[in-house]
Every structure is written in structure tokens, then in C-alpha cells.
């Protein structure tokens, strides 16, 4: 059986304890994974602290060269990494291979360039004096990364750190450890010096908690659940931190929208990446005059192909774990109990799966109609392939309903009225507003939200947590 250890100071370090990671589609055991704790974290942080001065003082062009080399190695190994990610997470292979892993490579290429352009500011005081600022790395950074799209998200955190001269300890979710292990290996192969990037496997309550509490960690970057994020903020002390937490993003579709395009984009926004994405458009608000037309949305949801994640034709694979499957399935049952109308999908596993997938964590794309915004399914993050359809009367009601939720990451507006777009973009409580399109990633712009989300990533924003 494959063993997954820690990467500390350039060495593959065995653990004292191990846990099994399994394929969510088949139940097959994939690897025996080291379960780190305080001892491994202390070792990794000490190593990162020791490596920091030399890495920080390495010329930026040399750091950029090593990062580009790492990006090239990822490109050369896309099929292998994508297959590993699909096996570990249940994500469809066409998404990991064609989108998510190539994006990870681009993260290194992008930040290698961006961070060479980061400079302080200079102000002439008079003809004899200048005031100037320096942009400097803070020291050791803790990177706590989630189980959904794990490789891409991990590289999104690692790349700006390396570019700025920061050393890091990466703690991946225990539900998706495999590709982080490969990242640690490829970083060394690319020539990243030992100790600059350390990867410690383990559980959040042990390895993760020890990492964010460590007195030599100067900054924490976390992506994950809101409850965990609040706990980290409480325990982080005076450290700088960036928190990318949950989402319950609204999609506002007005009667003057291009309905066919809106249907396709709304379908993609909620059901791609198995619905396990913080930017998922899970609350779809439809103007009353066109609400009956959205039976087409359920028809399209029923045509989404659910099945073997390794099949290139599969569009929705398996959810990350049995526990998460039970959570998402439970929300579907709850929505029906609360009075929503089930138009597609449902809380049970598909009955037409082949024998080797019968025990997998599969759910059909589910559409709940006639949802009231006060229902729990409309207020709480489900993090799965579940769309809630809600009617609205006019612009004012649409804005009120969209904002009436704890979360504020992304939002999506569909209308041909530019004035309406400008009003809504200003009034909607979301960090990102997409107009007449699904989520489109642009690394130059800030990624982040409002309300419980306190971080910004992308472009120069990614460095704000880890520079001084």
C-alpha cells in the first residue's frame, strides 16, 4: 500500500501514527497517510524559520525562475496529478485534467511575474529628503488548505508565499492528502531549497491547531468552513491572517435576461466541481414573470451525467466522504420537509450505478423549487449539488433577499439593463459580482468576500497577509 509521509526540511519523514484515505467513488483504500501532531509541526516550523533568511534574501528573479520550473513540472505531470486528485476527491477527471491542475501550474507562473513588480512607495519630502517604504516578507506562514479542489487551492496559497520570499508549512485536509504530497516532492525536484516548503499531513484538531497556534508562525492563510475559521481567528493571537470561509451565493435572473444563457450558466455554477465549491450559485432568484420557465432548469439538471469520476463523460462525480454525503442528503430531506418542491434529483443514491460504484458517495443534481429564503436550505451552506429556486417580484426584493444571508462571497446578475447592474453591484453584499456570466477566474483581481470572509487573494492581494 502507498505510504504518504510528511515533507520536512527536504526529507520524506515517516509518521508515528497513520490513517487511511479512501476513494470516495469506490471505497478503495488509496494510501496510508501520516498523522502529524505537535512534534511534526514544531519540526516543520523550526525548519521553515531556519530557511527563511536565505530564501528571503535570494534575488527575486532567482525565486521566480525556481517557481516557473515548478510550474513546468506540474504541466509535465498533469495526467498523473489529475488522476490522483480524482481518486482522492471524486471530482470528474475532465475537470481535474483540463481545468484544475493546469490552473495550479498557472498560479506559479503568474505569481512569479506579479511579485517582481511589488515595490514600496517613495515620497519626496523636500529637495534633501525622501520617505520610502519597503515590502518585506513576514517570516513563516501557515497554509491550511481545504479538501475541495485541493491541489489548485494549495498552489494558490504556496505560490505568492514563495514569490515574496516567505517560507511555509502547508497542512492539507486529511480528506485529500495525496496531491499535496506530490506538490512537496515536485517543489524539491524544481530546486526549491529544503525547508522553504514543508508539508505536514494530519487532522485539523491536532496538526492544524498546533500549526496556527505556533509562536514562530507569523501569518495564517486558511480556506475552509466558517466554524473552523472562527476558531482559528480566536487562537491565532496577534498573527496576521486571511480567512476564506463559506459561501451561499445568489444568482439574480431578471425577466430581460438571456434565459438560455442564464440557464446554462446557473447549471454550471451550482453543479460543477460536484457542487463542492464556495462560489456555487446555490440560491437562484428568478423574477416571477419568468419563474415558470425555470422548469427547464430541472430538465437540464436531470440530464447532467453522474457516475464514475474517471470517465471523461462524467459531469458530477462522488462527494468527498460518506459523512459529507449524509450532510448533503440530509439537507435535501430537510428542504422537502420545510415545504420546498423537489423538481430533480433527491436525497438517495442513484439506482443505476454499476456494481463497483454502489458504495460510492453519489448524489444526483438536485433542484428544490418554491423555496422560502427563511428556510434552512436557503440560509445554510450545503456544499453539494443542490440548487434552491426562489421567486422575486422586483429589483428591490431581489436585493433584499440576496443580502438576507450570513455569507457574502460571490453573486451573479443576469439582466440587459446596465443601470440596474450598477445599482445592484453597489448594493449587493458580496465580494465579487459577475454579470451575465458564470464564475470566471482572473488572477489579477481580488478573490474574497464580505461578512465572515476576511481575506483577499489574487494579484497583489495575495501578499497582504504575508508581507509587512
UniProtKB/Swiss-Prot annotation:
Gene3D superfamilies: Aldehyde Dehydrogenase, Chain A, domain 1, Aldehyde Dehydrogenase, Chain A, domain 2
Reactions catalysed, as given in the entry: 2-hydroxy-5-carboxymethylmuconate semialdehyde + NAD(+) + H2O = (2E,4Z)-5-hydroxypenta-2,4-diene-1,2,5-tricarboxylate + NADH + 2 H(+)
SUPFAM superfamilies in UniProt: ALDH-like
UniProt keyword terms in alphabetical order: Aromatic hydrocarbons catabolism, NAD, Oxidoreductase
Gene Ontology terms: biological process: 4-hydroxyphenylacetate catabolic process
GO MF, one annotated term: 5-carboxymethyl-2-hydroxymuconic-semialdehyde dehydrogenase activity
Active site: residue positions: 244, 278 (nucleophile)
Pathway of action: Aromatic compound metabolism; 4-hydroxyphenylacetate degradation; pyruvate and succinate semialdehyde from 4-hydroxyphenylacetate: step 3/7
Description of pH dependence: Optimum pH is 7.5.
Enzyme class: oxidoreductase
EC number, UniProt record: 1.2.1.60
The protein's role, per its UniProt record: Catalyzes the conversion of 5-carboxymethyl-2-hydroxy-muconic semialdehyde (CHMS) into 5-carboxymethyl-2-hydroxy-muconic acid (CHM or (2E,4Z)-5-hydroxypenta-2,4-diene-1,2,5-tricarboxylate). Is involved in a meta-cleavage pathway for the catabolism of 4-hydroxyphenylacetate (4-HPA) via homoprotocatechuate (HPC or 3,4-dihydroxyphenylacetate).
Family: Belongs to the aldehyde dehydrogenase family.
Complex formation: Homodimer.
UniProt name for this protein: 5-carboxymethyl-2-hydroxymuconate semialdehyde dehydrogenase
Organism: Escherichia coli
Gene that encodes the chain: hpcC
